[in-house]
Amino acid sequence: MKTFSAKPAEVTKKWVIIDATGLVVGRLATLVAMRLRGKHLPTYTPHVDCGDNVIIINASKVVLTGRKRDNKVYYHHTGFIGGIKERSAKAILEGRFPERVVEKAIERMIPRGPLGRVQMGNLRVYPGAEHPHEAQQPEKLDIGAMNRKNMRAA
């Protein structure tokens, strides 16, 4: 039997919606990264974007285990000398764009490169319950029911 290799024209993409309320960030990110890459499919091909389109709602209500909410630090650089800045996960989750914690966790699990950037484009993260993708009729995916460790009381 010959090895199957998916062609970009043969790939059919599904739309999946995930409610992130009470979900542990790392566990959510691993499952979403796998879906974005298409590794949950038997027809997975490493060099083709064969993953699903993923919508995450209520991203501001995710949970970090242990003391990570206070102690985890996110760094960025302004580009100027001595311009390294840091913010805690708590500051980001309580700030203007709380969905960035989830986006960064997923982004760091996707390979860097042209294909990784395309796959990250298939991710939509919203801090609240509203999203503009009703026309795509997304299929609901309950990550909390997959494993009891995926859910944590806030």
From Swiss-Prot:
UniProt GO MF annotations: mRNA binding; structural constituent of ribosome
Family from the record: Belongs to the universal ribosomal protein uL13 family.
InterPro entries associated with the record: Ribosomal_uL13, Ribosomal_uL13_bac-type, Ribosomal_uL13_sf
Protein name (Swiss-Prot/TrEMBL): Large ribosomal subunit protein uL13
Organism: Rhodopseudomonas palustris (strain TIE-1)
GO cellular component term of the entry, any: cytosolic large ribosomal subunit
Keyword Ribosomal protein found: yes
Role played: This protein is one of the early assembly proteins of the 50S ribosomal subunit, although it is not seen to bind rRNA by itself. It is important during the early stages of 50S assembly.
GO biological process terms, semicolon-separated: negative regulation of translation; translation
Record keywords: Ribonucleoprotein, Ribosomal protein
Subunit structure: Part of the 50S ribosomal subunit.
